[in-house]
Amino acid sequence: MRKKVAVVGDRDSVLVFKALGVDVFESIESTDARKTVDRLAKEDYGVIFITEQIAEKIKETIDRYNDKVSPAIILIPSNQGSLNIGMNRINTNVEKAVGANIL
């Protein structure tokens, strides 16, 4: 069974993903974003991209999915630039996997 891919964030940052066939969910409020991420997880989305600005507001929601195989939650910069939250998560996960920070 194929899993779906979604992106959650502000309109200007996520609209371009529509051209790639990714399901786009516009959200700027933390309450909306939390509900959207939880709904997408239940609806069999395998990958959910979330802009760092939204992720910063819904950290506890994202943390609930950290130990689960699906959905994979990947933080991406918005059109306003990066907060380095996504890269820090990658560094932490790589360090857990190999025992040292190789990035």
UniProtKB/Swiss-Prot annotation:
The UniProt record lists the keyword Lyase: no
GO biological process: proton motive force-driven plasma membrane ATP synthesis
Keyword terms: ATP synthesis, Hydrogen ion transport, Ion transport, Transport
Domain of life, per lineage: Bacteria
Annotated SUPFAM superfamilies: AtpF-like
One Gene Ontology molecular-function label: proton-transporting ATPase activity, rotational mechanism
Pfam (any one): ATP-synt_F
Its job: Produces ATP from ADP in the presence of a proton gradient across the membrane.
Similarity-based family: Belongs to the V-ATPase F subunit family.
Name the record gives this protein: V-type ATP synthase subunit F
Organism of provenance: Finegoldia magna (strain ATCC 29328 / DSM 20472 / WAL 2508)
